[in-house]
């Protein structure tokens, strides 16, 4: 990664939009508030990040299984978890300009020292009505009383909009893992401890989304539910806490931009023994990347109660039957990607100009290698001899437009670790020039040695 320089959030996000990492959603129709589409670079990088998550948390560990549950679930699922009754945000409207806000957020913004997470609805309302909180839009201090705003998106199954056909877009991936616990145990013949994982889209009707892709109404989670024998909660909590920190450090995030934040007792759900967030220092301030939560047996017990199904586990070691306890490591994929892009962005002052460079980890950047024919006349040879050779092992791009210097700058700006230039000498000596993104150093390598050279560089 680059030095820990500070760049404005606007500078970074403008670069991401112009470069093709992220586009405004529905742009040709004027866009949609806080809606973003991932372009070719962003989509590829998201997939790379998910693959690294799968390798670290699933493929390299015993008894870890990934499934792909449905986005629309039986609505009783959300009654069991309490989402239908309790998944709300405290909403207030300014009486003067009619702007709408989350009560806890505007209080926290104006009084950072207050623990709004630990405040009851009544306490939040007292603060809002005290005249000490002003509208961020018009500056007045007059709000409606707090009312609870349901954050789940509601829709209907079938041709009629009746209460009996009401369903919800899932607000988290976790419950698809819990309701499939019995199926996974049966079909994998696993013993505890055992984990079930999923990476997928979730939907929350946030009142105040913002900060680019940090808080949106549609986003992706990468979640694990890890099941084990009751009494081992803190052992596995510490294990997954360390695994999650190891993962984000492996991705290249700078240590000084990361911190653990342990939840205070007032913040914890009544069933939780402990919850910790890993936060990242974004240009706009500290923000949560992921959380590790001890959920005890709450979810499985609730699903047993509402479904009338037996979700207990018979332990073959001591022949006891119990409801497993759970630790949940949960990543926000979009937030993690945004943190990596913010951390990687750099501007380097060179002798004649300034270059923008994304110091992304190898294997994480959208492209591993860029193949650059020195002249358009060399395109077919470069494609046949270099692109076709490397594309089987590496994610390659092929660029023939502009001077070689401009092409180097374009690849630096999107984080491509290596550029390979195929020139007229390559036709004679079967060698190419390999340029390193970070050092800008160049070496001449035989084409038939490229795979071995790059395998070593990428640690494969």
Report residues per predicted region:
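NTP/phosphate- and nucleic-acid-binding module
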Residues: 1-460
């Amino acid at each position: 990664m680059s030095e820990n320089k500070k760049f404005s959030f606007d500078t970074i996000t403008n670069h991401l939009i112009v470069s093709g990492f992220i586009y405004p959603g529905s742009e040709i129709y004027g866009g949609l508030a806080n809606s973003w589409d991932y372009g070719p670079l962003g989509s590829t990088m998201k997939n790379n990040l998910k693959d690294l998550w799968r390798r670290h948390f699933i493929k390299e560990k015993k008894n870890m299984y990934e499934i792909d549950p449905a986005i629309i679930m039986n609505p009783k699922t959300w009654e069991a978890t309490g989402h239908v009754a309790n998944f709300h945000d405290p909403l207030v409207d300014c009486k003067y300009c009619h702007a709408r806000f989350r009560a806890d957020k505007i209080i926290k913004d104006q009084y950072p020292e207050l623990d709004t997470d630990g405040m009851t609805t009544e306490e939040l309302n007292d603060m809002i009505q005290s005249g000490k909180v002003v509208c961020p839009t018009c500056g007045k201090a007059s709000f409606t009383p707090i009312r609870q705003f349901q954050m789940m998106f509601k829709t209907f199954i079938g041709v009629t909009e009746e209460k009996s056909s009401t369903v919800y877009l899932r607000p988290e991936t976790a419950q698809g893992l819990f309701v499939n616990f019995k199926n996974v145990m049966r079909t994998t013949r696993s013993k505890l401890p055992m984990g079930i994982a999923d990476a997928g889209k979730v939907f929350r009707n946030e009142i105040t989304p913002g900060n680019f892709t940090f808080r949106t109404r549609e986003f992706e989670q990468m979640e694990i539910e890890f099941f084990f024998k009751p009494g081992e909660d803190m052992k596995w909590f510490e294990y997954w806490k360390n695994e999650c920190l190891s993962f984000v450090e492996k991705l290249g995030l700078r240590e000084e931009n990361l911190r653990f934040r342990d939840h205070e007792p007032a913040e914890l759900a009544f069933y939780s023994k402990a919850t910790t967030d890993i936060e990242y220092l974004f240009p706009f301030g500290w923000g949560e990347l992921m959380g590790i939560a001890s959920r005890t047996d709450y979810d499985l017990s609730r699903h047993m109660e509402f479904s009338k199904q037996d979700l207990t586990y018979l332990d073959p070691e001591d022949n006891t039957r119990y409801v497993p306890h759970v630790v949940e490591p949960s990543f926000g994929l979009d937030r993690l990607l945004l943190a990596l892009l913010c951390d990687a962005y750099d501007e380097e002052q060179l002798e004649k100009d300034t270059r923008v460079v994304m110091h992304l980890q190898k294997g994480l950047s959208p492209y591993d290698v860029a193949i650059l024919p020195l002249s358009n006349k060399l395109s077919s040879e470069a494609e046949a001899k270099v692109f076709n050779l490397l594309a089987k092992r590496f994610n390659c791009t092929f660029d023939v437009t502009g001077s070689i210097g401009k092409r180097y700058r374009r690849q630096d700006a999107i984080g491509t670790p290596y550029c390979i230039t195929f020139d007229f000498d390559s036709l004679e000596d079967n060698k190419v020039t390999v340029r390193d993104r970070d050092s800008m150093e160049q070496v001449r390598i035989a084409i038939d040695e490229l795979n071995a050279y790059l395998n070593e560089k990428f640690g494969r």
